[in-house]
Amino acid sequence: MALLDISSGNVRKTIETNPLVIVDFWAPWCGSCKMLGPVLEEVESEVGSGVVIGKLNVDDDQDLAVEFNVASIPTLIVFKDGKEVDRSIGFVDKSKILTLIQKNA
């Protein structure tokens, strides 16, 4: 399964209808974001259907970056039952992402 593309058209539905969602705020020109992408894909393949992991391109949806107070990328925001419960700024490794999931599951 591929990472979900998140945009203004589906962000609300995604975070409100899934119990645990991680949104990666990224941009195609961001080096750290490019490094984080494959790590997120690996995490997603390990955790299965219990967690939705999606990517939101801040260049395409600048208003959402502002709404969610994203000032630096990459930023991972963890939503549980529709509410933000955690966030991580900058590149993080697989173990940190798995810890975010376990802590908030």
UniProtKB/Swiss-Prot annotation:
CDD domains: TRX_family (cd02947). Disulfide bonds join C30-C33. GO terms for molecular function: protein-disulfide reductase activity. Keywords: Disulfide bond, Electron transport, Redox-active center, Transport. GO terms for biological process: cell redox homeostasis. The keyword Nucleotide-binding does not apply. One of its GO terms (cellular component) is cytosol. Residues 2-105 form the Thioredoxin domain. It comes from the Bacteria. PROSITE patterns: THIOREDOXIN_1, THIOREDOXIN_2. Participates in various redox reactions through the reversible oxidation of its active center dithiol to a disulfide and catalyzes dithiol-disulfide exchange reactions. Belongs to the thioredoxin family. This is Thioredoxin. It comes from Treponema pallidum (strain Nichols).
